[in-house]
Amino acid sequence: MGDKKSPSRPKRQAKPSADNGFWDCSVCTFKNSAEAFKCSICDVRKGTSTRKPRINSQLVAQQVAQQYAAPPPAKKERRERTDRDLPDDDHFDMDNSDSDRLSSLHPDSDHPERLGLEGGQLDRGHSLKERRQERVLDKPQALDTDRRPERAGLTPDLLQQQQPQPQQHPQQPQQPQQHSQQQPQQHPPQQHNRIDREHTDRAMLEKLQPLREHMEKDHPHTAGSGMQPAERMGAEREELKKGKIERAMMEKHKERHKSLTPSKKPTPKKMKPKLIQKSPAGESNGMKPGKSVTKNNKSVISRPKLKNVDRSSAQQLAITVGNVTVIITDFKEKTRSSSTSSSTVTSSAGSEQQHLSSSSESTDKGSSRASTPRRDHSSGHNETL
C-alpha cells in the first residue's frame, strides 16, 4: 500500500537517525521504536508527512505516562481525526491496529478479558438456544389446552352448524357424546337440501319440455329417438348457422339490386313547377326553380341581360345524376310586346343565366339529357294563353 511510488513526486526519505532506528511521529512527535511501523499513539504510518501543526512534546509525554497506567479515552478521538485527514494510500489495516498495538504493549493484559467475554457469550448463546427450544415445545401444549375449554363450551346451536370432526382430539371423553348429538341433528337439513334439489330439478324439466317439443317440431330430422342429446344440439347449431348465412346472403342481394337501380325520377317538388300562368303570377313562379338551381350551383355568374326572351314559353327539364338534380328551363324568343315588358325582362334574364350555368354543369358531368323543345310545342303553349 504505502510502498507505491507516485509518479508526480518522489517519496520523502526519512532522515537517518543516530538513535538505533527510533523515529519521531510526524503528527504527534512521539519517538517510536524501530520495530513499530505505526505510531503507537496516533496510528500514523512511518514515513508519512501530513503537514499538521505539531503538538507540544509535554502533552505527548503526559499521554505516554497515562497510557502505561490506563488506556486513555482521548486516544480514539485522536485516531478518528487522523483517519479523516490521511489520504487513502496511508490507511493500513485500521481494524487490526488496536489489537496489534495492545498486544505489543500489553501482551498479557487484554487476552484473558477477551477470553472471558467470549466464554460468557458462548454460554449465553447456548442458554438462549435452549430457552427457544423449550418455548417451541411448550407452544403446541398451550394450544391444546386453549382449544379444549372452547370445545367443551360449544352450544348445541353451533354444533348444528359444524360438520362432524371425528379425527381431531380422540382422547377427550366428551367428543363421542357431542358427535352423537350432532348426527341426528344434522341429518334433517341434509334431507331438506335433497328435497329442495329434486323440486328445482323437476321445475327445470317442466320448463324445458315445451321448448324441446317446439324444437322437435321445427327440426323433425333431429328429433329421432336414435339421436343422442349431444348430436341433437350439434345438428340444431348447424341449422341455425345455415339460416343466418342465408339471411345475410339475401340482404346482400337486396343491397346490390338497390345500388344497381338508382332512382332517376326527380323529386315532385322540383319537377312540377306551374308552366303556364298569367304574366304576374308566372314571373313569381318562374323564379322558384331558378332559386333552387342557384342553391345547387352556389355561384352566380354575371352575364348581359337578354331582352328578347318570352317568359311564357318556359319549358323545364329535370336531370338527376346521382344525388344532384339539375332543372333546366328553356325559353323562346319574344314574338309580341306585352305591357309587362320590363318585369318579364328582369325575370327572364335571371332564368336564362341559370339555364346557362346549369347546362354547363350537366355537360361537365357527361350526362346532359336536355333536348331543345320543338317550335310546335311552344306555339301550342302560346295558343293556350
Curated annotation (Swiss-Prot):
<feature type="region of interest" description="Disordered">
    <location>
        <begin position="1"/>
        <end position="23"/>
    </location>
</feature>
<feature type="region of interest" description="Disordered">
    <location>
        <begin position="331"/>
        <end position="385"/>
    </location>
</feature>
<feature type="compositionally biased region" description="Low complexity">
    <location>
        <begin position="160"/>
        <end position="192"/>
    </location>
</feature>
<dbReference type="Pfam" id="PF00641">
    <property type="entry name" value="Zn_ribbon_RanBP"/>
</dbReference>
<keyword id="KW-0804">Transcription</keyword>
<keyword id="KW-0863">Zinc-finger</keyword>
<dbReference type="InterPro" id="IPR039958">
    <property type="entry name" value="RYBP/YAF2"/>
</dbReference>
<dbReference type="GO" id="GO:0005634">
    <property type="term" value="C:nucleus"/>
</dbReference>
<keyword id="KW-0805">Transcription regulation</keyword>
<feature type="zinc finger region" description="RanBP2-type">
    <location>
        <begin position="19"/>
        <end position="48"/>
    </location>
</feature>
<comment type="function">
    <text>May be implicated in the regulation of the transcription as a repressor of the transcriptional activity of E4TF1.</text>
</comment>
<feature type="compositionally biased region" description="Basic and acidic residues">
    <location>
        <begin position="233"/>
        <end position="253"/>
    </location>
</feature>
<keyword id="KW-0479">Metal-binding</keyword>
<dbReference type="Pfam" id="PF17219">
    <property type="entry name" value="YAF2_RYBP"/>
</dbReference>
<keyword id="KW-0678">Repressor</keyword>
<keyword id="KW-0053">Apoptosis</keyword>
<dbReference type="InterPro" id="IPR033774">
    <property type="entry name" value="YAF2_RYBP"/>
</dbReference>
<dbReference type="InterPro" id="IPR001876">
    <property type="entry name" value="Znf_RanBP2"/>
</dbReference>
<feature type="compositionally biased region" description="Basic and acidic residues">
    <location>
        <begin position="362"/>
        <end position="385"/>
    </location>
</feature>
<feature type="compositionally biased region" description="Low complexity">
    <location>
        <begin position="337"/>
        <end position="361"/>
    </location>
</feature>
<keyword id="KW-0539">Nucleus</keyword>
<dbReference type="InterPro" id="IPR036443">
    <property type="entry name" value="Znf_RanBP2_sf"/>
</dbReference>
<dbReference type="GO" id="GO:0006355">
    <property type="term" value="P:regulation of DNA-templated transcription"/>
</dbReference>
<feature type="compositionally biased region" description="Acidic residues">
    <location>
        <begin position="86"/>
        <end position="97"/>
    </location>
</feature>
<feature type="compositionally biased region" description="Basic and acidic residues">
    <location>
        <begin position="98"/>
        <end position="138"/>
    </location>
</feature>
<keyword id="KW-0862">Zinc</keyword>
<feature type="compositionally biased region" description="Basic and acidic residues">
    <location>
        <begin position="193"/>
        <end position="221"/>
    </location>
</feature>
<protein>
    <recommendedName>
        <fullName>RING1 and YY1-binding protein A</fullName>
    </recommendedName>
</protein>
<dbReference type="GO" id="GO:0003712">
    <property type="term" value="F:transcription coregulator activity"/>
</dbReference>
<feature type="region of interest" description="Disordered">
    <location>
        <begin position="63"/>
        <end position="317"/>
    </location>
</feature>
<dbReference type="GO" id="GO:0045893">
    <property type="term" value="P:positive regulation of DNA-templated transcription"/>
</dbReference>
<dbReference type="GO" id="GO:0005737">
    <property type="term" value="C:cytoplasm"/>
</dbReference>
<dbReference type="GO" id="GO:0006915">
    <property type="term" value="P:apoptotic process"/>
</dbReference>
<dbReference type="GO" id="GO:0008270">
    <property type="term" value="F:zinc ion binding"/>
</dbReference>
<feature type="compositionally biased region" description="Basic residues">
    <location>
        <begin position="266"/>
        <end position="275"/>
    </location>
</feature>
<keyword id="KW-0963">Cytoplasm</keyword>
<keyword id="KW-0238">DNA-binding</keyword>
<dbReference type="GO" id="GO:0003677">
    <property type="term" value="F:DNA binding"/>
</dbReference>
<feature type="compositionally biased region" description="Basic and acidic residues">
    <location>
        <begin position="74"/>
        <end position="85"/>
    </location>
</feature>
